[in-house]
């Protein structure tokens, strides 16, 4: 068992002056660990409640809702190119900071991604990393606390602080391992994606892609797209979860019925007469009416791939075997190398811009995947192992 490291006592930050002093100290360090606590159950946009920062001699729990607190010093720290910002599973945290400061903290390092590159598998949790790399244990008792309630309890402050204190030895352990294996550049490639604001951008016109659609004609597809885009904009405008505007399962039904009035809206299961006759109902009816007026020639093509475009099952199976072999041999999480969608597209089309054909993924898997697809290599079983065989 590794000796448990000693950490500074956590400090609650509630004033701009205290935050500025903290950020000044952390600006002199090579890295700082970061986490957030937020609420999103009742809003479209996450409500930032707490920010945790961990330095060599500082552990701070910042009350982001403290009256009069200006988070500008935090934004300056996040923009400092000399300080690496270390997160675990950073996407939701980054989304919050992008909304708050208009920029992604950089440079950044995500220990979840690093763990997948360092051989910890697909689904490793933060508590497992803390145990494996730092000999510690994470108390999950306050995981689902109401972080918007004030005052914060001592137990909440201790829980929040633990997320960034243990993250320091986790980061140092992962970085040392990746340095030995020559894989820091791999993690840097992933960090570049995480640092791109486009990664977090929500386009209302693409909202329909989250829905599970079955059948339907081109007109219905146009309606699904229009209704989903309207719902996304409306949810953003009033800052409520999109499901509180119109539920996912109601959108295909609305597209199929294409109601022309409030009474028609109420025929969709779960839509009340109050909604149908109100401002939102009228706006939805306008969207439906304008979409019904689109000429047939301008309707979108239904997203049904022809039989010839479906990925050949045999090739998909071979590519998955190659992926599993390369992931296992190199101790890298398979889903970080290539997704199921990547494999299907690789098997069925010429898609040179797929992530699995770029950078370290190409070296590890993509180049041989193309050779396998082109009939230049084969896969052979050797006992419990799978080997790549060059073909003449």
From Swiss-Prot:
Its EC number is 3.1.13.5. It comes from the Bacteria. SUPFAM superfamilies: HRDC-like, Ribonuclease H-like. Residues 217-298 form the HRDC domain. Residues 12-178 form the 3'-5' exonuclease domain. GO terms for cellular component: cytoplasm. It is found in: Cytoplasm. It catalyses: Exonucleolytic cleavage that removes extra residues from the 3'-terminus of tRNA to produce 5'-mononucleotides. Keywords: Cytoplasm, Exonuclease, Hydrolase, Nuclease, tRNA processing. GO terms for biological process: tRNA 3'-end processing. One of its GO terms (molecular function) is ribonuclease D activity. Pfam families: DNA_pol_A_exo1, HRDC. Its main location: cytoplasm. Gene3D superfamilies: HRDC domain (1.10.150.80), Ribonuclease H-like superfamily/Ribonuclease H (3.30.420.10). PROSITE patterns: HRDC (PS50967). Its cofactor is a divalent metal cation. HAMAP family: RNase_D (MF_01899). Belongs to the RNase D family. Exonuclease involved in the 3' processing of various precursor tRNAs. Initiates hydrolysis at the 3'-terminus of an RNA molecule and releases 5'-mononucleotides. This is Ribonuclease D. The lineage of its organism: Bacteria, Pseudomonadati, Pseudomonadota, Alphaproteobacteria, Acetobacterales.
């Amino acid at each position: 068992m590794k000796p448990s490291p000693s950490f500074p006592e956590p400090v609650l930050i509630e004033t701009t002056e205290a935050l500025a002093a903290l950020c000044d100290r952390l600006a002199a360090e090579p890295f700082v660990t970061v986490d957030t606590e937020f609420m999103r159950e009742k809003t479209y946009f996450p409500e930032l409640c707490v920010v945790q920062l961990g330095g060599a001699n500082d552990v701070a729990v910042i009350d982001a809702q403290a009256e009069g607190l200006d988070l500008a010093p935090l934004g300056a720290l996040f923009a400092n190119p000399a300080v690496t910002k270390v997160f675990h599973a950073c996407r939701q945290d980054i989304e919050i900071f992008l909304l708050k400061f208009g920029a992604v903290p950089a440079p950044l390092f995500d220990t979840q991604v690093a763990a997948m590159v360092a051989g910890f598998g697909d689904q490793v949790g933060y508590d497992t990393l803390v145990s494996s790399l730092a000999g510690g244990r994470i108390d999950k008792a306050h995981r689902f606390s109401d972080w918007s309630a004030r005052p914060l309890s001592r137990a909440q402050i201790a829980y929040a602080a633990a997320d960034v204190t243990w993250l320091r030895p986790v980061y140092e352990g992962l970085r040392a391992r990746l340095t030995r294996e020559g894989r820091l550049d791999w993690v840097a490639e992933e960090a570049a994606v995480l640092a791109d604001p486009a990664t977090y951008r929500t386009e209302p016109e693409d909202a329909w892609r989250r829905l599970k659609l079955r059948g339907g004609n081109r007109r219905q597809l146009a309606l699904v797209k229009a209704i989903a885009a309207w719902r996304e904009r409306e949810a953003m405008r009033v800052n409520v979860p999109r499901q509180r505007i119109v539920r996912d399962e109601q959108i295909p039904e609305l597209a199929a019925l294409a109601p022309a009035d409030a009474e028609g809206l109420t025929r969709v299961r779960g839509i009340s007469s109050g909604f149908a006759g109100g401002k939102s109902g009228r706006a939805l009816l306008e969207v439906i009416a304008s979409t019904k007026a689109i000429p047939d020639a301008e309707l979108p093509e239904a997203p049904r791939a022809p039989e010839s475009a479906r990925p050949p099952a045999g090739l998909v199976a071979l590519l998955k075997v190659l992926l599993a072999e390369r992931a296992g041999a190199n101790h890298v999480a398979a889903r970080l190398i290539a997704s199921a969608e990547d494999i299907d597209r690789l098997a069925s089309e010429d898609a040179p811009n797929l992530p699995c054909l770029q950078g370290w993924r190409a070296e590890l898997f993509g180049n041989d995947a193309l050779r396998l697809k082109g009939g230049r290599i084969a896969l052979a079983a050797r006992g419990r192992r799978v080997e790549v065989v060059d073909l003449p």
